[in-house]
C-alpha cells in the first residue's frame, strides 16, 4: 500500500514528531533527516515539525521514508517551488544528504503508477529497477539536493523504458536436459531453486 507523507510546521518548542504507526527505523528518520537537510545546505525549520504517515492503521517500516520526509519538510516552507503533482518518493538518507538504495522499488512504482501517479523520485542505484515499470516519468537522484532540484523542474523526469511484452505463444521449452545438476558442485539451495524453476517452467537468473 502507498503511504502519504504530510508535514506541518507549528508554533512551539522546536522538535520533530512522527505519527502514523511508525516502527523504530522510521522514528529514527527524524535525526537523519535533520542532519541531511542541514548538511545539504538547506535551513531546517525552527518551528515544531509534525510528520504524518497515513493511513494511520498501516505499520510503516524501513528507512525508505527519509527522502520523502525531508522533501516534505522543504516543501512545507514557503516558496519551495516544487511541482504541484503527486510524486512517488523513496530513499534512505545519509547524514551528508546522499541518497542510499532501498528495497521494494519495483513493487512501489507498480502500485503508484497503477493508482495514477505520474512521477517518481528514486535513488540512482534503484533507477534501472524503477524503469522496469514502464509508462511513467522517473528520475534517479544521488542526493537530497538533486531530489529538491528535480521537484522544481518537471523536465528532469525521464520517460521510463518501454518493456516489450512477449506473447506466451512465442515461448517454447525444450525437453532436453543439457546437464545433470547432480554432477555440479553447487550449493544445495541453488540446486533446489533450479529444480523448482524447471518443474514450474519459471525464469531463473543466476549471477556470480
Where are the language model's segments positioned?
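Peripheral, non-AAA+ core regions of ATP-driven protein-machinery
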Residues: 1-207
Amino acid at each position: 500500500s502507498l503511504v502519504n507523507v504530510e508535514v506541518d510546521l507549528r508554533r512551539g518548542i522546536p522538535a520533530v514528531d512522527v505519527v502514523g504507526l511508525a516502527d523504530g527505523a522510521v522514528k529514527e528518520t527524524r535525526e537523519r533527516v535533520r542532519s541531511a537537510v542541514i548538511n545539504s545546505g538547506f535551513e531546517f525549520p525552527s518551528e515544531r515539525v509534525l510528520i504524518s504517515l497515513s493511513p494511520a492503521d498501516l505499520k510503516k517500516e524501513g528507512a525508505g521514508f527519509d527522502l520523502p520526509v525531508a522533501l516534505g519538510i522543504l516543501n512545507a516552507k514557503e516558496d519551495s517551488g516544487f511541482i504541484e503533482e503527486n510524486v512517488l518518493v523513496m530513499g534512505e538518507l545519509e547524514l551528508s544528504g546522499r541518497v542510499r538504495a532501498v528495497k521494494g522499488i519495483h513493487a512501489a512504482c507498480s502500485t503508484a503508477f497503477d493508482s495514477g501517479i505520474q512521477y517518481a523520485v528514486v535513488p540512482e542505484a534503484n533507477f534501472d529497477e524503477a524503469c522496469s515499470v514502464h509508462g511513467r516519468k522517473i528520475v534517479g537522484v544521488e542526493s537530497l539536493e538533486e531530489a529538491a532540484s528535480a521537484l522544481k523542474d518537471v523536465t528532469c523526469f525521464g520517460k521510463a523504458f518501454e518493456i516489450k511484452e512477449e506473447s506466451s505463444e512465442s515461448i517454447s521449452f525444450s525437453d532436453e536436459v543439457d546437464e545433470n545438476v547432480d554432477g555440479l558442485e553447487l550449493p544445495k539451495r541453488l540446486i533446489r531453486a533450479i529444480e523448482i524453476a524447471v518443474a514450474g517452467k519459471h525464469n531463473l537468473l543466476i549471477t556470480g
